[in-house]
Amino acid sequence: MWAVQGILAALYERWHTGKGRLVECSLLETAIGFSSWTSAQWLADHKEPTRQGSRHRQNAPYQRMQTKDGYLMVGAAGEAIWARCAKALGHPEWCEDPRFATNQARMANRQALEAVMNAVLTTKTTNDWVEVLEATGVPCGPVYDYAQMFADPQVRHRGLVQYASDAELGEVPHIRTPVRIGEGVRVRNVAPKLGQHNAEIFGRLGVGQAELQELRARGVF
């Protein structure tokens, strides 16, 4: 991802200036680059970051929450969204509670916040809460397992799952690349088996059938 961004930036510059650029992107820098939140925290206070699970490091509640039949992601960052969230959950008084009145207070009392929210969210299903929260403008979404993910109407509509033909296994399902250009290119066949095209390739090199049989007899391939 970082390499692609660098390449696109260099191409854009070449388009405007006519000059090329050397684009570098190491795995080390890429790994550290993905830790921007925790790196910024450590550089500011030199305190070792701790594991947060699905919790956001700067906002609460902004995390996965349990429901009656699964899990839900809630992103109530900011006071306006938090007020709508509390009201949608049937507890507008949470906004007046000193423990939850501000984001700073909610971060400091995260365990208590999670406890009261879980007590409410576990009374209804994930789909019920998605409908309620979306209706009030609270960012949210279901947390899928794999069966739910591949059954999702949008995943099916986008044709993310494709099939390749295998002589032994039949139609083999796989996920295509997420990038689509125009109609896209579909993989119709699986990778060749070891040595499957030996005769064809050796034939292009001028190796005849008799020599091929000799090579096979000698165990060359």
Identify what each model region corresponds to:
Residues 101, 165-214:
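Flexible, small-/acidic-enriched active-site or ligand-binding loops
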